[in-house]
Amino acid sequence: MRTTYMAKPGEVERKWYVIDATGVSLGRLSSEVASILRGKNKPQFTPHIDTGDFVIIINAGKIGLTGKKATDKIYYRHSQYPGGLKSRTAGEMRTNNPEKLLELSIKGMLPKNSLGRQLFKKLHVYGGSEHEHAAQKPEVYELRG
């Protein structure tokens, strides 16, 4: 009888991918990046092992928001002090802090446990077209669709 293949942490080969976010829809990009971080695009995917690759996203400030999300989608945060609720629209976040906009979107698509936190550390988001990971020789990743 055959047993199910389970990847071991030591035998996982990781690649570095660079993705250009110019004009790409936020949700479509986020779901694909979450899948790469998780390793679901590999045949040796194992749910409880980090089999994913590293992802560099450039031009985060040029991400696309469809419909009226730029004005209607609101992100909330709270300082834990009375009256400390802060809110920002997606358009304001895209202008002021585009890296945070993408990170929040991708983090919400990863597991909510210690593995998810480990996967999130392999994501690097940059607002401009320059990144500091040239030494890793990242491959350009073409998005599906």
Curated annotation (Swiss-Prot):
GO terms for cellular component: cytosolic large ribosomal subunit. Keywords: Ribonucleoprotein, Ribosomal protein. GO terms for molecular function: mRNA binding; structural constituent of ribosome. It comes from the Bacteria. One of its GO terms (biological process) is translation. SUPFAM superfamilies: Ribosomal protein L13. InterPro entries: Ribosomal_uL13, Ribosomal_uL13_bac-type, Ribosomal_uL13_CS, Ribosomal_uL13_sf. The keyword Ribonucleoprotein applies. The keyword Ribonucleoprotein applies. PROSITE patterns: RIBOSOMAL_L13. This protein is one of the early assembly proteins of the 50S ribosomal subunit, although it is not seen to bind rRNA by itself. It is important during the early stages of 50S assembly. Part of the 50S ribosomal subunit. Belongs to the universal ribosomal protein uL13 family. This is Large ribosomal subunit protein uL13. It comes from Listeria innocua serovar 6a (strain ATCC BAA-680 / CLIP 11262). The gene is rplM.
